[in-house]
Amino acid sequence: MPIQEALESLRSGKPVLVFDSKDREGETDIVFASQFITPNAIRLMRKDGGGLICVTMPSKVADILGLDYLIKIYERSRMPFVKRLYPNDIPYGEQSSFSITINHRKTFTGIPDADRALTISKFAEIVEHALSSNSEYKKAQVVSEFGRNFRTPGHVFTLIASKGLISRRKGHTELTTYLAYLAGLIPSTTIVEMLGDDGKSLSKSKAIEYAKKRGFVFLEGKDIIKKFLSEPLPNI
């Protein structure tokens, strides 16, 4: 079963490819479990993917850390440009999952492979600590840890998965965060869109061809959604 093969790949620190839907973005993302990100993984993502390297988090973690969707942060700023640039015309009809950008404080510029790998792997630890915090005191400790170790703006884009995951939104953020949950890993993935040499997103057929050539699992969003409907996760 492709789902099980994908979970094994994620547990082993290997990437999987996820195509959302022809009726949505129609894009394939390279996906790693954030806890296993290495400089080599970042190199593969930027060279074979080419899109924007982002790290996901469950909405519960965002709530604990006091993070919000970037558009909500802009709205609260009440700066005039926000109204003029409001994203009310996204072609695939969904709110963006983007939140703030971050760098780990031990990075230099934050952009080299090693810097981004450090930022992402350490952020995965924050996600784990936040989800295991079972008191207000422990939550406050995680918030303090986040502030001590990270700064913004940075070179890693964070994404907040919708509450209820796929039941609310069917983007790569939700699809892949759910896969990490299923794999029993820290529920944070690192994702990047695959781009072609024609100035467009890499076609599905070429993404499948790439997966076969590299021995990577290729998953379709519809298969992940089907799994979610039969095995939803509580309290997410």
Question: Predicted regions span which residues?
Answer:
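Catalytic domains of riboflavin
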Residues: 1-236
